[in-house]
A protein has these predicted regions:
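Feature for intrinsically disordered/low-complexity regulatory segments and propeptides
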Residues: 1-10
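Catalytic core segments in nucleotide and nucleic-acid processing enzymes
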Residues: 11-165
Length: 165
């Protein structure tokens, strides 16, 4: 692991890749808080079908985020990937870009199909983990993170902006 300072940071990373379900949501919230990324939990169990989060990155419009985690090595399918679109429409975020975080991964047929939508991307946990690590290191700004996430299709580590010195 790269320059991860302290046991708490290492635990964040380990939990991010290991946990599923509600525990995964909690570690996701902890990481956002640690990185000082503003978010609002929308799915508080009082609103039927609400998306999970509204993420507010610096100098960027809000993003509606849905977390989909699967047990073992199962992949998030098309239907689960696009649920966030309906949830965002119903709950008043019809103009917001939507992201489905697929943990551990997304079915490979999904990104090409959803790219035409123009308002949705999927990101696998390993790719988002790399991006968040770069935010922590200061080599990726929140605005750059937004631009990377808000590109229709799939947000891949290979597409992250690199820092020139």
């Amino acid at each position: 692991m790269r320059n991860v300072r302290g046991d708490a940071n290492l635990k964040f990373l380990q939990d991010f890749y290991k946990l599923r379900g509600v525990e995964f949501e909690q570690v996701f919230e902890n990481i956002l808080s640690f990185l000082k990324i503003s978010f609002k939990k929308l799915d508080d169990k009082t609103k039927t079908g609400a998306p999970d989060y509204l993420i507010e990155l610096q100098d960027s419009p809000p993003i509606v985020f849905e977390l989909k985690s699967k047990l073992a090595d199962s992949l998030v399918d098309y239907n689960k990937s696009v649920e966030v679109l309906a949830a965002s429409e119903v709950h008043g975020y019809k103009d917001a870009f939507c992201v489905t975080l697929c943990h551990p991964g997304v079915d490979p047929s999904v990104p090409i199909v959803i790219a035409a939508c123009g308002r949705l991307s999927v990101v696998e946990s390993n790719d988002l983990g790399e991006a968040l690590l770069r935010v922590c290191e200061g080599t990726l700004t929140q605005a750059q993170l937004y631009a990377w996430l808000a590109s229709p299709g799939q947000a891949l580590t290979a597409d992250l902006p690199f820092r020139t010195y």
